[in-house]
Every structure is written in structure tokens, then in C-alpha cells.
């Protein structure tokens, strides 16, 4: 996977995290723990990004941008278990804060919010 394609996946993941909770939940079938899937999404892409940039020495995010993205992922990782229910994803103030932070990150990356590409996340 090219580093540019990886950047695209990360941006789409941030768009997904900026989306309304009902939109987020609609992406997943009923038989999965949707909260867990949402929580792992950005982190999985970040792991691949960090591995790829170390191997290729080719960053496409500035250090400041990368720290903002990692901070967003950390905020999600620090949520208590009760925040991963479908109800919490759509109603919790903590998820509202995560969505707002994701929107701010998109702006800082000169990206506009749009419906995320389902096939890229």
C-alpha cells in the first residue's frame, strides 16, 4: 500500500469519527460489537502508518498533525467500557466531544467533512 493511499484511509477514518453516531452504527452488522469496531478503526490505520513511515522514511503528516490524530485515537482508547454501547455512541457527551475533535482535525488538515467512503475504512 502506498503512503498516499494510507493517508487517504486515515482521513476517511477521521471523517467516520466526525460522523453522527447513527451513521457510524449503520456501517456495521448487528452481530458485531459496533463500539469496539469504531474504537479500533483509527488505531489500526495509525499502526500501519507508523510502520510504513519508519520503513520508508516518508511522512505525509507533519509532527503536529500526527500528534493531533494520535490524541484523537488516545481519547477513544481511554473511554470506559460503558461508552461502547450503541446508546452511548449516539448520546454520550464523550462521543460528541470526539466528533468535534475529529472535525477540528479535518479542518487543520485542510480536509472538508463529507460522508466517509465505506470501502476505505
Residue ranges of predicted features:
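Short terminal alpha-helical segments
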Residues: 1-49
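Structured alpha-helical bundle/scaffold domains in large eukaryotic membrane-trafficking regulators
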Residues: 110-121
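Short, flexible helix-adjacent loops and helix caps
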Residues: 22-26, 81-84, 114
Amino acid at each position: 500500500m502506498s503512503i498516499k493511499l494510507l493517508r487517504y484511509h486515515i482521513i476517511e477514518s477521521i471523517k467516520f469519527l466526525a460522523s453522527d453516531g447513527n451513521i457510524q452504527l449503520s456501517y456495521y452488522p448487528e452481530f458485531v460489537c459496533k463500539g469496539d469496531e469504531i474504537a479500533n478503526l483509527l488505531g489500526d490505520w495509525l499502526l500501519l502508518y507508523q510502520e510504513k513511515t519508519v520503513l520508508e522514511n516518508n511522512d505525509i503528516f507533519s509532527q503536529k498533525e500526527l500528534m493531533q490524530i494520535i490524541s484523537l485515537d488516545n481519547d477513544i482508547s481511554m473511554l470506559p467500557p460503558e461508552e461502547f454501547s450503541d446508546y452511548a455512541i449516539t448520546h454520550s457527551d464523550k462521543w460528541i466531544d470526539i466528533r468535534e475533535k475529529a472535525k477540528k482535525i479535518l479542518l487543520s488538515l485542510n480536509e472538508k467533512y463529507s460522508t466517509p467512503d465505506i470501502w476505505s475504512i
